[in-house]
Amino acid sequence: MRVAGAAKLVVAVAVFLLTFYVISQVFEIKMDASLGNLFARSALDTAARSTKPPRYKCGISKACPEKHFAFKMASGAANVVGPKICLEDNVLMSGVKNNVGRGINVALANGKTGEVLDTKYFDMWGGDVAPFIEFLKAIQDGTIVLMGTYDDGATKLNDEARRLIADLGSTSITNLGFRDNWVFCGGKGIKTKSPFEQHIKNNKDTNKYEGWPEVVEMEGCIPQKQD
């Protein structure tokens, strides 16, 4: 009886050890697989992050050099979507900010710091050009000036207003007509014509929208004003 009991004990211990061994092996395999999957996912995530294109200020296509301000802007779309003006990753004017309107939309910024100074819009269809002229005359030297049209920005413009905008570096302002789309970035005290300007004429044969041309967009890097 004692021999039989001892034999049963030996068998029970052997079964226990075998079961423990099998379970430990299976668990180790699963652990290895889990760790392998974890490392694989980590490697894939790292690769995805490394291949993701970088984002630059205002969403422009490439980084600006030192001592330059990044900007991006778009004219309005017909009389439905307002213009958008972004400077140094700060949206200065947009429909979402509810500070745009029919006519010419203007944002002013400090040419040394990029700090926004003012944002306004002037109705050039049903409004008066006189306040716009006074606004243009009051702009201080060294100020960055960004402008974009919405709906119609030309009907009420007179020669004086156009001349003042031309003095900011605009070339196309003399030809801006009814419902043209136009974006411009210049500055008070600029000595040459600005390279930052886009203009598309209102033409019934080529208009993207009924009665309005397509949106014009522009981005670039504005040199910081030096002392």
Swiss-Prot record:
Q: Which domain of life is it from?
A: Eukaryota
- Places the protein is found: Secreted; Cytoplasmic vesicle
InterPro entries assigned to the protein according to its UniProt record, in alphabetical order = FAM3 (IPR039220), ILEI/PANDER_dom (IPR039477), ILEI_FAM3C (IPR039475)
Q: List the disulfide bonds.
A: 58-86, 64-221
GO biological process terms on file: epidermal cell differentiation; ERK1 and ERK2 cascade; gene expression; inflammatory response; keratinocyte proliferation; neutrophil differentiation; phosphatidylinositol 3-kinase/protein kinase B signal transduction
Which CDD domains does the UniProt record give? ILEI_FAM3C
Domain GG-type lectin as annotated: residue spans: 67-225
What range does the record give for the signal peptide?
1-24
Task: List each coiled-coil range.
Answer: none
Q: Is Signal set as a keyword in this record?
A: yes
Keywords for this entry? Cytoplasmic vesicle, Developmental protein, Disulfide bond, Lectin, Oncogene, Secreted, Signal
Question: Where is it made, tissue-wise?
Answer: Present in most secretory epithelia (at protein level).
Q: GO molecular function, one example?
A: carbohydrate binding
Q: Which GO terms describe its cellular component?
A: extracellular exosome; extracellular region; extracellular space; Golgi apparatus; platelet dense granule lumen
Main role? May be involved in retinal laminar formation. Promotes epithelial to mesenchymal transition.
**What else does UniProt say about it?**
Up-regulation and/or mislocalization in breast cancer and liver carcinoma cells is strongly correlated with metastasis formation and survival.
Family per similarity comment: Belongs to the FAM3 family.
Q: What is this protein called?
A: Protein FAM3C
- What is the originating organism of this protein? Homo sapiens (Human)
